[in-house]
Structure formats: structure tokens, C-alpha cells
Design a protein with these regions (language model features):
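Sec-exported extracytoplasmic/periplasmic mature domains
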Residues: 53-57, 78-82, 102, 119, ...
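Conserved C-terminal helix/tail region of periplasmic/extracytoplasmic solute-binding proteins
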Residues: 218-248
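Periplasmic-binding protein-like
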Residues: 94-100, 140-163
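Extracytoplasmic ligand-binding site segments that recognize negatively charged/polar headgroups
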Residues: 1-105, 109-119
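Mature extracytoplasmic/periplasmic domains
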Residues: 153, 157, 162-223
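A ligand-binding cleft/hinge motif common to bilobed small-molecule-binding domains
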Residues: 119, 125-142
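Short, hydrophobic alpha-helical packing/hinge segments within bilobed ligand-binding/sensory domains
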Residues: 48, 114-117, 133, 171, ...
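Ligand-binding "clamshell"
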Residues: 17-21, 136-147
Length: 248
């Protein structure tokens, strides 16, 4: 990071990705939230715990564990139980997911599936990444996207330099360009085309009233990240537990 002039302008959560996990610099970020049809439900959803309400039986879709936010969903389940996921390797989380199962219609892999289920009335609630918002909103104009007040989980996209890179200095220059105020401002302004990227440069003035602005503020204020140095060694076990709990 010391070689990047624009690194100093990154939001703290983005800096932590490089510092804590050893990845390359983050250049964009996504966050997980809840999209729902208030009219179909007759009530609002404000927290992750609301997903476990019996009134939502047979109304929810959540991402498969191999999805970008699959592991984050496991973390949400552990949070619901009030257990630090690292203290039991996810045991409480899968107990919570078993309790959630009656409410789950499907575990999905693509946002297009969520859009189709909303438009057909098959579901009224889904856990999605912010990047899927536009796709689902087009299929279900009345749908509302919320980030729970208690917080959420963010996923950072990073740029890494390969071990045998022959142009390291040039690679750093390109990364610095990608993190610049000009570039991050330009890419964040494309939301109307469904391409808006949430920036990590804290100096970017994102457009008001957009999903990009919403995510940008949430990540700065109350987003956590998944520690993949903890998760990856457990993924095979978790995948088996996931299938036994939700797909058997």
C-alpha cells in the first residue's frame, strides 16, 4: 500500500482487507441486504432476525453457499444465534439455518433466478448482493431493498499482482490509476446502466439517492467482512452441512 499514492484515500474497511487478509488492494465493494415486497407481505423487514419469522414460511430465497454471499449468510445465521462463528466453526449457524428452512423456497445461484421468482410470486423476500438490485427491481418494481440497521457483510473486489509479474512498477501504477478519484467517480456513476460500482475511494461524491450511495454509506458505517482465512479451510465441511440442512 505504501507504493500507492491513492491508497491513503481508501475507506478504512477497504484498507483492512489488505492489512488483515493479505490480499491486494480493494477497488470496489458490494454488500448483502434484503429485498422484499412489502405489499405482498403486509409488513416491513428491518433486521436479519425478521427472516426467521413464522409469517415468512415458504416465502424466502437465499444464496447458495458457493455464491459470493453464501458464506456471509452462514455468518448472519451465527449472528442470529448470538454466537461468534469462530468459537464453534459454524455449529450454531447451521442450527439457525435448520430453523430457517421452513421459510426457504430455494437457495439460488444467479440473480436472474431471484428476479423470476419475484415476478412469478413464488417468493416475497430474498437475501441478495446489492449488485443484483437492478435485475430484481426490473422484474418486481414494488420491491424494496434494505440493509438491516444492525449491519451487514461486505465483499471487496481486489487487484493482486502475480508472483512472477515482469512489470511490477507498471502494475502498481495501474492499480493506483484504478483507485484514483477520477476513475472511481466515473465507474460509480454508471448505475443507470446496471454497471455502477461502489467505490472504495473515500473522496468520491456518489450520486444521491442511488443504490451505489446506499451501499457506500453502509460499508463505511456498519459493514463487516468475512474472514476467508477462517472460512476456506471449512468450506468443504460447510458445503456438506449446507446440503444436508437445506437441500436434503
Amino acid at each position: 500500500m505504501s507504493k500507492l499514492e491513492n491508497g491513503k484515500d481508501m475507506i478504512e474497511a477497504a484498507k483492512a482487507v489488505n492489512k488483515d487478509n493479505g490480499y491486494g488492494p480493494a477497488y470496489t465493494v458490494n454488500a448483502m441486504g434484503i429485498i422484499y415486497d412489502k405489499e405482498a407481505l403486509g409488513f416491513e423487514i428491518n433486521e436479519w432476525a425478521d427472516l426467521w419469522k413464522p409469517e415468512l414460511k415458504g416465502k424466502i430465497a437465499i444464496p447458495v453457499i458457493s455464491n459470493t454471499f453464501g458464506p456471509a449468510m452462514v455468518h448472519v445465521a451465527s449472528d442470529y444465534k448470538g454466537v461468534d462463528i469462530k468459537s464453534d466453526d459454524g455449529k450454531a449457524a447451521f442450527e439457525a439455518l435448520a430453523e430457517l428452512r421452513p421459510n426457504i423456497v430455494k437457495t439460488y445461484s444467479k440473480s436472474a433466478e431471484v428476479a423470476n421468482m419475484f415476478s412469478s410470486g413464488e417468493i416475497a423476500v430474498a437475501v441478495i448482493g446489492d449488485y443484483a438490485f437492478n435485475t430484481v427491481k426490473k422484474a418486481s418494481p414494488d420491491a424494496t431493498f434494505v440493509y438491516p440497521a444492525s449491519g451487514t457483510y461486505a465483499s471487496f473486489n481486489t487487484i493482486d499482482i502475480t508472483k512472477n509479474c515482469k512489470n511490477v512498477d507498471l502494475a502498481y501504477k495501474w492499480i493506483d490509476y484504478r483507485l484514483s478519484l477520477e476513475t472511481e467517480t466515473r465507474t460509480s456513476s454508471l448505475e443507470n446502466n446496471g454497471l455502477g460500482e461502489v467505490p472504495v475511494n473515500g473522496k468520491v461524491e456518489v450520486a444521491e439517492g442511488t443504490n451505489v450511495e446506499n451501499t457506500f454509506n453502509v460499508v463505511r458505517e456498519r459493514a463487516k467482512t468475512v474472514d476467508y482465512t477462517f472460512v476456506l479451510p471449512l468450506m468443504e465441511t460447510w458445503t456438506n452441512q449446507w446440503n444436508q440442512t437445506l437441500n436434503s
